């Protein structure tokens, strides 16, 4: 449902933000 979609979207956003933060710390993913 909508709630599950929101949770999945939030998780994806958090994952992206975490990757960006870690990348800025000096650990590029790619």
UniProtKB/Swiss-Prot annotation:
Domain of life the protein comes from: Eukaryota
Record bears the keyword Secreted: yes
Compartmental location: Secreted
Coiled coil, from the record: none
Major subcellular site: secreted
Any one of the GO CC terms: extracellular region
Keywords: Amphibian defense peptide, Antimicrobial, Secreted
One GO term of the biological process aspect: defense response
Expression (tissue specificity): Expressed by the skin glands.
UniProt similarity note: Belongs to the frog skin active peptide (FSAP) family. Dermaseptin subfamily.
Physiological role: Has antimicrobial activity.
Designated name of the protein: Dermaseptin-3.4TR
Organism of origin: Phyllomedusa trinitatis
Taxonomic placement: Eukaryota, Metazoa, Chordata, Craniata, Vertebrata
């Amino acid at each position: 449902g909508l709630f599950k979609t929101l949770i999945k979207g939030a998780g994806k956003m958090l994952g992206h933000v975490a990757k960006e933060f870690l990348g800025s710390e000096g650990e590029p993913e790619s």
